[in-house]
């Protein structure tokens, strides 16, 4: 069982996936890994379609299929199963099987003899057979016949991508949800030539889809390499649920067999399969438990052992965590509570929010949408730096827009490609221009304005001294900084942060002790400062948020503290709280997103900033 989970085509690739930003665009319906532990991989991508104004529930679905071991044995079967796998994974996410299209990507060795010419030919026949039987067409693709270098060749490769559009409210994730729920297996029979019975498969897909859109199914996993055993194990990990197979379970060998077109299905609310799947064949597998064990006849396997076997194989190549180093004493500081909400001395119905976009920034659309949804007027300006004249013109425009706004927002991204020796330097250099610096000082000190920096914007605020000092100053030896993540790479995931202090207008709508699930995506987010300076900031209520574990305790340990920030610091403020810098992308959430992640995801930062001017 454990050896099966440790195979390279079965084991976790989470450490690789986290290198890629999964939440940009404010449309991620399902995170790549779901459950409270974020360990169960999602069957594919579900994201709302991007719109400049408002919100849509229309979401795109994309799922892939390919098994290199099958393709090496038979390119025909490899391509046929690839189409089937991609379609099944799309249906498992909520797609209608009658509204799926495909795109195929092919990659084969150099075609220098009769045998190698037969590989793409047989693969295309297998793919066409599956498409014809499922009544699903491939409407695009790409191919390459250059997969040979000296004596090295790629396996015969035809990767199928299934694409569809769904209502994001109907999207369903892979991790098991609730103890007590029944779990079944739906199979697609194969003949003596290992060809799938497509008539049965089409019926299975339609019946399963109807159950999903009727909210009768809690989770669905597609059988891939590793068989039912791997599917059940991985689906348990997300929420630390155990599984008890029916007793006796006699056909244990079938648990490890590749069964293309098969599904593991968790029924919702203790429903019985007889009520939902009377028209198709299925097998009762068992039910979910709170035991943190997988029980098969007289054998019990702990989830701890399963987790270790599943995560360990690629940990040295694509690590998920690194040692946090020496423990920091007094990391758990008292909460700082401001008794009265902080408000502006004047009222503006729709405050203007100026969002300058520097080269490499990519969060301006998400940020503008968040402020406008809260009632503000977002004004986005793209800084031009192609020539000296354009830079000067951009600075003049920035001065005018700062003088005309109530809120200055520095969004996240990768300013100047996160240039060497620290990101955010280009932004900080621009803001140290005398005219811009005077405009910022006027906004903050004379007009009681607000300033917010997220991710790259936080890095710029730190380099300018706006946090924690409240004004643009030269950096001192003991000034806080943000440096490279302890793990030495980009990290994209959801973390939990706790409100430590509400001494800021940006936190008027939350209470100290509140915990939120927030997206992070950065390579340089590790907060560092001398211990005396950190304690001074705590005492002054300027440490606004900390990374916390599943028990709500501040921690230095990954993955809860994704970058190794000292004292688990995620966000800090200026002395008066009107300038706030944080790493987590609070702007990337709207209701209906990140459905496979637990917790309160609305930090109410943007509504707090806008309502400050009521």
PLM region spans:
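N-terminal beta1-alpha1 cap of cysteine-dependent amidohydrolase-like domains
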Residues: 298-454, 458-469, 483-491, 498, ...
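Short hydrophobic/aromatic beta-strand micro-patches
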Residues: 264-268
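General beta-strand structural signal in soluble alpha/beta enzymes
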Residues: 46-48, 61-63, 102, 139-141, ...
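Amide-donor transfer/coupling interface in amidating biosynthetic enzymes
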Residues: 285, 393, 397-398, 439-442, ...
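Intein/HINT protein-splicing elements and their conserved insertion hotspots or analogous self-processing inserts
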Residues: 1-58, 66-71, 115-122, 137-259, ...
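Short coil-to-beta-strand
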Residues: 53-63, 95-101, 181-183, 407-408, ...
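Conserved phosphate/anionic-ligand binding catalytic regions in large, soluble enzymes, centered on
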Residues: 38, 87-96, 175, 219-235, ...
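A glycine-rich phosphate/pyrophosphate-binding beta-strand-loop-alpha-helix module
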Residues: 72-143, 147
């Amino acid at each position: 069982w454990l050896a099966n989970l440790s195979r390279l085509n079965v084991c976790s690739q989470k450490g690789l996936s986290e290198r890629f930003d999964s939440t940009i665009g404010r449309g991620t319906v399902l995170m790549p890994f779901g459950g409270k532990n974020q360990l169960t991989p999602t069957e594919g991508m579900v994201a709302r379609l991007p719109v400049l104004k408002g919100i849509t529930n229309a979401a795109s679905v994309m799922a892939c299929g390919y098994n290199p071991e099958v393709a090496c044995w038979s390119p025909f079967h490899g391509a046929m199963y690839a189409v089937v796998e991609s379609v099944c994974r799309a249906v498992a996410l909520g797609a209608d099987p009658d509204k799926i299209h495909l795109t195929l990507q092919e990659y084969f060795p150099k075609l220098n003899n009769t045998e190698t010419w037969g590989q793409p030919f047989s693969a295309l026949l297998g793919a066409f057979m599956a498409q014809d039987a499922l009544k699903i067409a491939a409407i695009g693709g790409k191919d390459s016949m250059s997969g040979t270098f000296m004596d090295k060749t790629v396996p015969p490769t035809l990767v199928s991508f299934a694409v569809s559009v769904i209502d994001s409210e109907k999207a369903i994730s892979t991790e098991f949800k609730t103890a007590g729920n029944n779990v079944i297996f739906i199979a697609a029979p194969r003949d003596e030539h290992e060809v799938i019975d497509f008539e049965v498969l089409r019926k299975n897909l339609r019946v399963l889809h109807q159950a999903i859109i009727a909210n009768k199914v809690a989770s669905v996993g597609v059988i891939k390499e590793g068989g039912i055993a791997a599917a059940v194990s991985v689906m348990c990990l997300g929420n630390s649920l155990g599984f008890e197979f029916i007793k006796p379970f006699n056909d244990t060998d079938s648990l490890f067999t590749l069964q293309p077109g098969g599904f593991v299905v968790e029924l919702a609310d203790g429903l019985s399969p007889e009520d939902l799947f009377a028209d198709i064949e299925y097998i009762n597998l068992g039910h979910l438990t709170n035991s943190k064990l997988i029980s098969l006849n007289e054998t019990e396997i702990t989830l701890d052992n399963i987790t270790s076997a599943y995560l360990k194989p690629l940990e040295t190549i694509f690590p998920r965590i690194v040692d946090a180093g020496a423990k920091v004493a007094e990391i758990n500081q008292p909460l700082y509570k401001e008794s009265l909400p902080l408000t502006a001395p004047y009222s503006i119905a729709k405050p203007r929010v100026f969002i300058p976009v520097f080269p490499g920034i990519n969060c301006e659309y998400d940020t503008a949408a968040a402020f406008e949804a809260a009632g503000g007027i977002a004004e986005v300006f793209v800084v031009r730096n192609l020539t000296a004249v354009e830079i000067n013109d951009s600075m003049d425009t920035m001065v005018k827009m700062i003088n005309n706004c109530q809120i200055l927002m520095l969004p996240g991204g990768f300013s100047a490609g996160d240039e060497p020796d620290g990101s955010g330097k280009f932004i900080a250099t621009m803001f140290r221009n005398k005219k811009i610096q005077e405009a910022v000082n006027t906004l903050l000190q004379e007009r009681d304005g607000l300033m917010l920096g997220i991710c790259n914007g936080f890095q710029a605020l730190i380099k300018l001294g706006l946090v924690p000092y409240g004004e643009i100053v030269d950096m001192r030896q003991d000034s806080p900084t943000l440096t490279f993540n302890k793990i030495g790479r980009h990290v994209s995931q959801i973390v939990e942060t706790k409100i430590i202090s509400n001494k800021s207008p940006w936190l008027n709508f939350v209470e100290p002790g509140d915990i939120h699930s927030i997206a992070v995506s950065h390579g340089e987010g590790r907060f560092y400062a001398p211990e005396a300076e950190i304690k001074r900031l705590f005492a002054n209520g300027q440490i606004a948020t900390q990374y916390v574990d599943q028990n709500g305790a501040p921690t230095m340990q990954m993955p809860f503290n994704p970058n190794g920030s000292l004292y688990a610091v995620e966000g800090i403020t200026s002395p008066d709280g009107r300038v706030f810098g944080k790493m987590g992308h609070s702007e990337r959430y709207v209701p209906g997103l990140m459905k496979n992640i637990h917790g309160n995801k609305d930090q109410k930062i943007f509504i707090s900033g806008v309502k400050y001017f009521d």
